[in-house]
Amino acid sequence: MFKFNDEKGNLKCSFCGKPQEQVRKLVAGPGVYICDECIELCSEIVVEELGVEEEIEFQDIPKPKEILTILDEYVIGQERAKKALAVAVYNHYKRINTNSKIDDVELAKSNIVLIGPTGSGKTLLAQTLARILNVPFAIADATSLTEAGYVGEDVENILLKLIQSADYDIERAEKGIIYIDEIDKVARKSENPSITRDVSGEGVQQALLKILEGTVASVPPQGGRKHPHQEFLQIDTTNILFIVGGAFDGIESIIKRRQGEKIIGFGSDPNIVDVDEGSIMSKLIPEDLLKFGLIPEFIGRLPVLASLEQLNEAALVQILTEPKNALAKQYQKMLELDGVELEFDEGALAEIAKEAIERKTGARGLRSIIESTMLDVMYELPSREDVKKCIITAKTITDKEKPKLLLEDGTELDEGSDTKTSA
């Protein structure tokens, strides 16, 4: 029986070594003693461990509307895609909580395909979902994968990235999210099955089938190729949510051809109908992915299709300023640490957006444009304690003029010198 320190004697804690006189309570066990401080420490460790278990159980899955509201804080536009993702993610983790089987009805996985041009927000959507749910997240590039036996990465290395993201906690990793980018680059070259080996196309799709559906995979703990004498990590992929994304360049013409099969007329192509480019992707169906070069079994394991639109100038300006982690806010915070207020006028934001559209890089290209614009400023300002404000104008972007630098009294620093001029 445990007892408190009501006995006198030269007793001390078996864990921290403190004598009885230096602690408030000393609990005795068969041949051992533990003090109140060590009990408190052990209690904290247990609570912390139980907290992780509760996190894994997903008892409070956010509802689709709540997921969409949080996505809106980070991702501009793409309303249809965000709604599809919110529903798919909610259903996926609800399925995990019910062990995927209710009254003999087995709930299938809701793996997702994101289709949209470069810089439209595919990767950001996947990252934000993982952040909302507080689950491990990993990104893989499909172009680096090859089927087993060929030079390149095995598909199991994707799972290793997720395990590493979960700090090698396999149970946590088994409820994570994996985003595979550039999936369109592993499409086979034609609709018909190839009689020759396609190691980085159809072969990769075949290799991905099992982990998409759910299997216990053997993963080399250090990555690389498998060899017979190494130990493997075992991970069950049944409850891992897979999101695959790609630009799928040219799929619009496949959709148009299907839409226009019965359209005939003098001087017109009977296979193509004139459809608004903005709405064409909303008519995407799985058969279009089959025509593009994904194999039927692969498409069957990706039941949720979500298409993203090309971002226009207005959307790119919003991306620069509105999200919680907007680029403009990031650079303003960066200069604020040097005691300088940064301002982008409306003309500057519009020109940054136009340049990103011209480069065909979408939102992904915004950072590089701002970075090149701000390089000289970020180099000079840490050494200029007299400068209190920096203004980026449209001409700073288009004509490469230097930004306006204002001193504490509101006067402008003369370009190329320390001379003050009227602001």
Swiss-Prot record:
ATP binds at residues 117-124. Keywords: ATP-binding, Chaperone, Metal-binding, Nucleotide-binding, Zinc. GO terms for molecular function: ATP binding; ATP hydrolysis activity; ATP-dependent protein folding chaperone; protein dimerization activity; unfolded protein binding; zinc ion binding. The keyword Metal-binding applies. PROSITE patterns: CLPX_ZB. Residues 1-54 form the ClpX-type ZB domain. ATP-dependent specificity component of the Clp protease. It directs the protease to specific substrates. Can perform chaperone functions in the absence of ClpP. Component of the ClpX-ClpP complex. Forms a hexameric ring that, in the presence of ATP, binds to fourteen ClpP subunits assembled into a disk-like structure with a central cavity, resembling the structure of eukaryotic proteasomes. This is ATP-dependent Clp protease ATP-binding subunit ClpX. The lineage of its organism: Bacteria, Bacillati, Bacillota, Bacilli, Bacillales. The gene is clpX.
